[in-house]
């Protein structure tokens, strides 16, 4: 399957998705799971299944019960020997009494893969918990040192990406949208070629064993590494089925590296649960590892502290 468009303007900007009202699609409803037939009432506002209705906000985010935001819907297209079929997949269920299967498909031949969602279905006040990772949506912000910072938590159509100077990637979210390691590597590799500055990749606890992150070549002339050429990294309490990126396991990064790791899962969790803890203390306690003193200086900045 090839992804024809995803991100905030997928249903509006992608020519392949200009559908008439009588087009039938195979889809995933974020409330009740997969359906063989879903019908668009209006391509720009509403998608319905047998029992639920999903509306889009003005900026392209799907919402449902009481305006609760769903994860963005990802649209992919397959071209079998027959009529065109469109798949619409919601990567995480919006409201569930217990964990259930979640659609994982952009780089997979099959649109639905078994996956256990480890997020609780609702918070203490009963509101549905939507999202995955630290930041809910792709965001472009301006920083006096880093310039235009693109925070990428969901894969987006390259043609729709805004220009940026620094790219921050959350591989946990990308792992939901690209369970196929090679597909994710291709995607991130392309992003790195578009990025004129630094790509900062935070590491975190995976929600599935298929976290699609790996070492990139240090030199542009070096042939790309296959994920099978690198041994899996064993993390206490976790089992990685594919190589995880950690530049510190193989020595300090070289000037040719375009990819930098700035944190560990424990550091992020500790920081989020204890906001009084400074980044310097995290580094001193070896709970967090940085590739340069400059990163520490940036992390101490109030903007980045608020961001993460």
From Swiss-Prot:
* Source taxonomy: Viruses, Riboviria, Pararnavirae, Artverviricota, Revtraviricetes
Domain of life from the UniProt record: Viruses
List the protein's name.
Putative uncharacterized protein PXBL-I
Q: Which organism is it from?
A: Bovine leukemia virus (isolate Japanese BLV-1)
